[in-house]
Amino acid sequence: SKEYKKYAEQSKLELPAGKIVKDYLLRDFKLPEEKLEACAERICYLYDARRNRITMRPYLPETVEELHKIGIRQGIISNIISNTFVPEILKRYGIDRYMECVIMSSGTGIRKPNPKIFHIALRQLGLESKECAYVGDTISRDVIGAREAELGLMIQMHNPAIEHKDKAFLDSGYKPDMMINGFNELVPIIRRINGGGYQC
């Protein structure tokens, strides 16, 4: 719902699935709480599936595999209300085995750009922030979050489909280190700059 989206974006927090369903998505239906709890995850999954019409970007599997081959550890940080949506997508794309950590706001209660969600990923990987490069497609969540978490490198991937969401942040002062148009550009960049010792 727009109301929950506004709450989540302003607070940078994610509520538990049961609370999202009860207080926002199905609030007007006055259903028994125990029934809502029982189906909350499924409802959140369907909500995310409808809201996030996922299509795999070109070169994604090849890039993930090549980064793995050259010793780059990988993970994902996602703002999502379902606990099962992202793992299912990663499996569908055949890249789940390469992800050493999958950090979701649904599991942490924290949303990007809150730097704490980035710090959770760093702790799971046992790495320092300066050892990590981050690739994301928004200023509002990814660039700001990576900068606030003081990650070593921030690469923004151009995404025309969501550019309109970032208009309010263009003058925020937060900039990526570089822009790319697709995953096929990523491995050459990492090879070229990895004198910086990026591990992730």
Regions inferred by a protein language model and the residue ranges of each:
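N-terminal helical cap/lid subdomain that shapes the substrate entry/recognition surface
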Residues: S1-P58, E65-K69, N83, M178
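Asp-based, Mg2+/Mn2+-dependent phosphohydrolase catalytic module
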Residues: P61, E65-H68, I77, I81-N83, ...
